[in-house]
């Protein structure tokens, strides 16, 4: 992460801020700050003066991934589409993945400070930052490293954790005081398992074991990007991250669990999952822009903390988009769907996903050049059947032709209004796979959303489906527009 931040600073995209901001529960200013900075496509910030923080002297990293360009920079690109194609290409070709490299613990920055056993006290040693109306503070910067308890297959996933210091109980109760010192509630959907960490947790539970986990915070952004991608089960996201960054990720063995973590992480927490201890947590601001009032999650008991001598803490929240990690969450969604579709359908040119998770698939052909009638609907079904974790959860998918910019929603709307008939050119699915936090779906506190309607819109030209010809588009030639711009230089 520090190399990435240095690149941002050199580029003028990282600012050090000494102005005080309130980070306390109930009075915090950070949701408003997030809204203000992200709505302006503002820079990354290092906040050096957050009032109410329980760990003095720890700077708070804010908004590092807040634009498409900065997210592209995490894997060495400036252009968003080039970064997406790079992600899709590496994901689709595991021969380009680079296995992680194990390094000597003595040289690992994440082990400059080691705290074990009775010395562990999360309420004193880990920053707690509140956003909006959230009841607890949440760890939002961390990846979970785990192994399949049966096969040993590795997994890295980006999950949230509830901290218990000064946390309000969503049902009006109280948490045991020791929770604040050693425990976190983990956003692991494990029963039934809706993720790889869920599978690992569920397997360990069935085997009568406690799953070992290592939670690494503020790491190489390429690893954060990889951990948000749906790679094949039991594949190593750290190797995928190596392929994305062009060199192996340096890893180091943990102190108290049989796992490896990134050697350059700012923080590492080692512990075990207690599926027999569940806690209701809330409020939590989710990525679709609503507060979850109550959710039930298992406890992770921490037995070791390691960190850099002068660590950085990354704090963010989810809310109505845009927000800080919107785009680093969207790039893997777009990349994994594009990677899968291009293997099966060469006419797929691009996949764009909006911050609100509307999918737009751009084809390289349209009209009479389409391979067969109803080709747009064929593509819609392919999105819902795509490999990875995201395509199957697409609530709204729109297919457009090559003359429609999938990133320009005005153009997408134009294609819909002039090429789409709602009854004839749509697919409605009543039993689709949901985005797990969608508040409009059937949902439970423990299982999340479990069923969603889905809609697909074929906004391609309906040749040969209904017509043999279509009116010519009335559109200015781009070269002519550029010539006019030069002609009016200094006037407009």
Identify what each model region corresponds to:
Residues 1-492:
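Extended, highly charged
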């Amino acid at each position: 992460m520090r190399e990435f931040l240095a690149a941002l600073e050199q580029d003028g995209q990282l600012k050090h801020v000494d102005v005080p901001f309130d980070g306390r529960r109930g009075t915090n200013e950070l949701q408003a700050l997030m809204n203000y900075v992200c709505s302006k496509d503002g820079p990354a910030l290092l906040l050096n003066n957050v009032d109410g923080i329980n760990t003095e002297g720890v700077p708070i990293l804010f908004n590092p991934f807040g634009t498409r360009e900065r997210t592209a920079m995490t894997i060495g690109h400036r252009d968003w589409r080039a970064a997406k194609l790079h992600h899709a290409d590496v994901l689709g070709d595991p021969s380009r993945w680079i296995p992680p490299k194990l390094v000597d613990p003595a040289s690992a920055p994440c082990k400059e400070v080691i705290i074990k056993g009775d010395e562990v006290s999360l309420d004193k040693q880990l920053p707690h930052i509140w956003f909006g109306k959230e009841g607890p503070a949440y760890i939002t910067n961390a990846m979970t490293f785990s192994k399949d308890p049966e096969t040993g297959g590795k997994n890295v996933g980006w999950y949230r954790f509830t901290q218990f210091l000064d946390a309000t109980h969503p049902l009006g109760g109280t948490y045991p005081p020791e929770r604040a010192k050693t425990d976190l509630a983990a956003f692991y959907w494990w029963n039934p398992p809706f993720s790889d960490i869920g599978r690992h947790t569920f397997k360990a539970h069935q085997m009568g074991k406690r799953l070992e986990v290592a939670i690494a915070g503020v790491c190489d952004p390429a690893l954060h990007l990889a951990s948000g991608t749906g790679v094949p089960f039991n594949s190593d996201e750290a190797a995928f991250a190596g392929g994305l960054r062009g060199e192996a990720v340096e890893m180091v063995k943990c102190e108290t669990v049989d796992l490896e973590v990134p050697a350059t992480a700012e923080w590492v927490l080692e512990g075990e999952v207690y599926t027999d201890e569940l806690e209701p947590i809330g409020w939590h601001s989710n990525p679709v822009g609503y507060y979850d009032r109550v959710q039930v999650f298992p406890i992770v008991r921490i037995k070791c903390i390691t960190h850099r001598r002068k660590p950085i803490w990354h704090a963010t929240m989810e809310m109505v988009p845009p927000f800080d990690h919107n785009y680093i969450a969207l790039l893997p969604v777009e990349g994994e769907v594009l990677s899968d579709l291009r293997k099966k359908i060469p006419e797929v040119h691009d996949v764009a996903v909006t911050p609100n998770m509307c999918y737009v698939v751009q084809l390289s052909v349209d009209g009479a050049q389409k391979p067969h009638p109803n080709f747009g609907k064929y593509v819609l079904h392919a999105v819902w059947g795509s490999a990875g974790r995201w395509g199957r959860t697409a609530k709204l998918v729109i297919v457009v032709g090559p003359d429609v910019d999938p990133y320009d929603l005005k153009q997408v709307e134009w294609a819909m209004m002039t090429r789409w008939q709602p009854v004839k050119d749509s697919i409605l699915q009543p039993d689709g796979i949901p985005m797990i936090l969608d508040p409009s779906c059937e949902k439970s506190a423990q299982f999340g959303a479990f069923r969603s309607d889905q809609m697909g819109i074929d906004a391609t030209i309906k040749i040969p489906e209904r017509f043999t010809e279509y009116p010519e588009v009335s559109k200015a030639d781009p070269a002519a527009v550029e010539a006019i711009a030069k002609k009016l230089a200094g006037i407009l």
